[in-house]
Amino acid sequence: ILNDWKTETNGVRTAGWFQQFDLPNQNVKVFFVPVRHWSRRGLFDMNKRLWGGYVIQSDTATIYFGGDSGYGRHYKEVGELFTKIDYFLIGIGAYEPRWFMEANHNSPGDAIKAFQDSGAKTMVPMHFGRFNLSDEPPNEPLRALLEEAGELSLTDKIKVLTINESLEIK
């Protein structure tokens, strides 16, 4: 992922989509999974590195970190491979204007479709409300998400964390 920063001691590893990593001395597996975005760290390295999300599996829970992504079939593919996702962390902000942001950032409606595609039990929205990154007001993504979730009777499946709040997963 950060190949140029890789050293023998910093633990950075390169990964391909769906590659699995086992954490030493723990019953935890980490899978690097596809998202729809782009990458750039310098002037001449556009899309030279792979972008992605993660599925983290333990004996007690499976977490799907959807990364920074636009809507796509990858959500359904991940849900088909990992059939018991407990928590799906997905971006809901930085989506306006759609003509520019749609390929790389989910709208709240896209996030709900992705949640349904993934088959996860609980959605944890992220990537909203802290920084003004695009044209929608900072509070709009959560408002729109909860409105649409209410229309689809999904409100009880969404766990909203406040800024700096954590969620203990056992």
Enumerate the predicted regions with their spans.
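Conserved beta-strand segments of alpha/beta enzyme cores
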Residues: N10-R13, K29, T122, K157-K159
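Residue-level detector of functional hotspots within protein domains
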Residues: T7, R40-G42, V55, G109, ...
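Helix-loop-beta element that forms the nucleotide-linked donor phosphate-binding surface
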Residues: L2-G16
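Core dinuclear metal-dependent hydrolase active-site scaffold
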Residues: T14-T83, I163-K170
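Cap/insert and terminal regions of metallo-dependent hydrolase folds
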Residues: I1-D4, T62, S69-T162
